[in-house]
Amino acid sequence: MPYYICNTCGVQHAQTVDPPNSCLICEDERQYIHPDGQTWTTLEDMREKGNLQNILKKEEEHLYSIKTEPEFAIGQTAHLIQHKGFNVLWDCMTYLDQKTIDQINELGGIQAIALSHPHYYSTQVEWAEAFQAPIYIHEDDKEWVTRPSNHIHFWSGETLNMKPGLDLYRLGGHFKGGAVLHWSKGNEGKGCLLTGDIITVAADRNWVSFMYSYPNLIPLPASKVEEIAAKVKPLQFNRLYNAFSKVVKENADESVQRSAVRYIKALNSELFHT
């Protein structure tokens, strides 16, 4: 039986004879059902079509971005961190083929997979099986897992130390279990924060933003944004990578704090009067 994949969000579902009637991810107000209706594919069909490829790009020393071209579903970018012989795949993407597996194995493989939130669960189990790697998801997002697996480990609390210098932090916001990855050795020791879109980079790369639903433009409350900013304030990070190939290259920690203040002012009618 096939593992069907939603064409809109790219998340793979449990094995069924026929396509599911609906997609749990897309029916939620943080995603959307395509105007043309719910459609499905499989990883096998995607490979057979032969029109997709994954592009690995070196972003900085020991950090690679991975993106599918042409864009599929949400179109997110995953990241591979090389950390003292322990490689972490941060967030995931739907398309996986042998070429990608070979390229990543040349870089040392994958020893762990960590997810920011359910929109990027994609074919995480396929990746875990290909590299025999555990998947780390915060327990607050357990209900959104559409393909269960023994590879999945649900972590609890506010932080998870994967290895010295690699830590997951639960920030919530976009999803209750929404997490970011702090890589203290990144950016030549100045620190990197990989955020998915728990914190996203704005069009002006000196600013970031926060949302409950990006496609449906539902903001987060001021109290939650204030809480997110407070949680990352003690962390040292000069650079921030989001899930869509946008980067705050310098002073990212200051950008987050400054952006949170602006966001809260906007919600409280203190930023502008139009």
From Swiss-Prot:
Highest taxon, organism lineage: Bacteria
Protein name as annotated: Uncharacterized protein YmaE
Species per Swiss-Prot/TrEMBL record: Bacillus subtilis (strain 168)
Lineage of the organism: Bacteria, Bacillati, Bacillota, Bacilli, Bacillales
